[in-house]
Structure formats: C-alpha cells, structure tokens
C-alpha cells in the first residue's frame, strides 16, 4: 500500500529535512519507488542537498499548469554512479560493488528558493491559494498514479503557517519531530491541539519522533547514585565546564528524576504515540552531506535508527 509521510515540527531545526531525506533514500535503497518533496516553501533546502535545477519547481506546479514530469527529477542514477565512482577510487577490486546502491527509484521535487517566488506564493490571492490547494491534492494523486510511488516523503516548514498546514493535508502519516526542550514540547502541544487533531479526526495518523536525544554524544545513564546527583543539585549545565560530559550526564539524570517520564506524559496527554527516540549523533553534523548518511554509512547507528523508524511505519 502506498503512503504519504510528512515530517513537521512546531520549532525549526528539529531535524525534519535530515530525517525526511535519509528516510526517502533508505526506502529507495530497499527497492521502493519514492518521491521526496521539499514542501518547506518558506525556506527550501533540497536544491542545495541535490545540487539540481529542475525544469519546473513545485511552486510552478502549484500556481500554474506546470507538468509534474517537469517538476520531479530522477536522482537514482546520479547517486548510483557517484557511488560506483567512490567505490572504484577506494579499491579497483570492488568496482561496481552494489551494497549501498539504490535499487528502487528516487525522485525529488524542489521548491524555488528565490525570494520573489516565495513571496509570490505567500501573497497569492484567495483564488490562487484555493487553486494551489487543489493542485496539492492533485500532486499526491499524480505521484501515486504516474510515478507509481510506494512512498511520498514530504519535508515541511515548521510552525503554523499557511503552506506548512496545507502540506500536511496530503499526508497519511504525520511525523511530529521534536527535541527534548521545553520550547519544543510546549510548541508541540499547541500544534497538536490546533492542527494535528483536526487531521487525525480526518483519518491521518500522527506519531511523535523525539530527535537528538541523549544516548550517543552524551551517554544515557540511569540514576544509580542519588547522593552523587544531590551533590550537583542546583547547578545548571551552563555553569559546568563545557567538556565535562559526565556532569552533563548527571544533570540530565537529575532532570529525569524531577520529572520522570515526561516524553510519555506528553504522548499520553496528546493521545499521540511515540514512534522513535533518535539520539543526537554529533559526528553526522560534521559530515558535509548529512542527508546522505544512510547511503554513505550503512553501519552507522543513525542508519539503524532510520531503518527502525521506517519499519515501524
Ligand atoms: N539525530 C541527529 N543527530 C545529530 N544531528 C542531527 C540529528 N538530526 C538532525 N541533525 C542536525 O540538526 C541540524 C538541523 O537539522 P535539519 O536542517 O534537518 O532540521 P529542520 O527541522 O529541517 O530545520 P528547519 O526547520 O530550519 O528546516 C542539521 O545540522 C542536522 O545535521
Ligand atoms: Mg528543514
């Protein structure tokens, strides 16, 4: 059965684009036909990730009669030939190694990053906006019918803005991505109550994805020594030496002891299940192409987390 999955969050910088891209690539690597859409209309990024210029942008599709075939770019072969090239440099014996090649298909649809194009959509009159919403629905239908997409993966703009909400309207599954900060949590409560609930009532499924949680850069510790924790009571992370990972870990443990299981409490309050806890892997932030982690580093724990996430969907 085909599915349309959207990554959204209240606050920016929660990892939506990274997770969307890696999920799409991993699904394509597994042999599925995948369409990845940059519907972060206000601040697109996939044109930078994929370094491609489409014949037509998603903006053209939404506001005019641009053809879907001119919007979607087939990037499967460019990944596979890049991969073969890297393999051949690494070892002549392994030329053509197929391990991390994409065996399915991957297309991307890009949003136009030019200010005037973003502005044009933002300030469009009601009729144009109404037509664009119809085209949004049509976009999904075309990808399912003409491209025979098994999965449509959608990256969205954060927050409660016109195009973020409309991007969610085409999704069957909403992945509400958040970090473990009060701002993210309070924000998620707001969008859940004001927006997601309405989509859930209309039949979409929603899940919480906690991203960049402790457990890798900062090891996760269970509270084994209460006395040790009481010694650091009253301190803040900012007062601690920056490289003192052990004390940050203790502070996190203490924080947990104060409010034992708030990720689950949020989930219970909202009636939205948690689908994933993805640790913060600071090493992937140093990669120049973090959106390709699952392709380049198939044994990285981040790749396993993305596998788990897509298996759970
Ligand atoms: N699990 C993770 N571990 C470490 N770094 C991560 C993880 N997930 C995402 N990041 C990093 O966090 C940063 C923000 O990610 P990303 O751009 O995907 O967020 P976003 O939600 O799309 O942001 P925006 O709302 O601005 O579009 C990037 O540098 C990315 O590499
Ligand atoms: Mg993004």
Q: Residue ranges of each PLM-predicted region?
A:
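Short, ordered loop/turn segments at secondary-structure junctions
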Residues: 39-42, 113, 158, 179-180, ...
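P-loop/Walker-type NTP enzyme "switch/lid" segment
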Residues: 41-144, 285-292
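Short amphipathic alpha-helical segment that frequently serves as the phosphate-/nucleotide-binding helix
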Residues: 17-22, 185, 189, 303
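Short, hinge-like loop/turn segments at secondary-structure boundaries
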Residues: 52-56, 194-195, 224-227, 293-295
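Walker A/P-loop phosphate-binding motif and the immediately C-terminal alpha-helix
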Residues: 2-42
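Hydrophobic/aromatic beta-strand patches that form the interior of the parallel beta-sheet core
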Residues: 5, 37, 107-109, 173-175, ...
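Conserved GTP-binding G-domain of TRAFAC-class P-loop NTPases and closely related GTPase folds
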Residues: 259-260, 275, 280-312
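Conserved catalytic-core segment of NTP-binding enzymes
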Residues: 29, 134-275
């Amino acid at each position: 059965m085909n599915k349309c999955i959207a990554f959204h969050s209240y606050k920016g910088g929660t990892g939506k684009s990274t997770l969307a891209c890696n999920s799409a690539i991993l699904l394509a690597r597994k042999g599925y036909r995948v369409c990845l859409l940059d519907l972060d209309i206000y601040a697109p990024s996939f044109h930078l990730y994929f370094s491609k210029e489409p014949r037509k942008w998603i903006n053209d599709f939404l506001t005019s009669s641009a053809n879907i075939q001119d919007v979607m770019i087939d990037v499967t072969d460019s990944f596979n030939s890049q991969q073969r090239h890297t393999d051949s440099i690494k070892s002549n014996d392994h030329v053509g190694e197929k391990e991390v090649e994409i065996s399915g298909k991957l297309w991307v649809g890009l949003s136009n990053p030019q200010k005037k194009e973003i502005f044009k959509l933002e300030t469009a009159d009601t009729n144009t906006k109404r037509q664009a919403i119809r085209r949004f629905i049509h976009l999904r239908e075309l990808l399912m019918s003409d491209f025979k997409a098994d999965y449509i993966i959608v990256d969205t703009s954060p927050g409660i803005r016109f195009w973020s909400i409309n991007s969610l309207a085409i999704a069957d599954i909403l992945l509400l991505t958040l970090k473990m900060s009060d701002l993210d949590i309070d924000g998620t409560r707001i969008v859940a109550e004001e927006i997601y609930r309405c989509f859930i009532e209309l039949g979409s499924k929603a899940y919480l994805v906690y991203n960049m949680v402790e457990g890798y850069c900062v090891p996760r510790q269970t509270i084994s020594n209460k006395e040790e924790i009481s010694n650091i009571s009253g301190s803040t992370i900012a007062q601690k030496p920056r490289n003192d990972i052990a004390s940050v870990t203790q502070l996190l443990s203490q924080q947990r002891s104060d409010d034992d299981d708030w990720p689950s409490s949020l989930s219970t309050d909202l009636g939205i299940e948690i689908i994933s806890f993805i640790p913060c892997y600071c090493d992937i932030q140093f990669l120049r192409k973090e959106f390709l982690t699952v392709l380049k580093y198939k044994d990285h724990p981040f790749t396993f987390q993305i596998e788990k996430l897509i298996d759970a969907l």
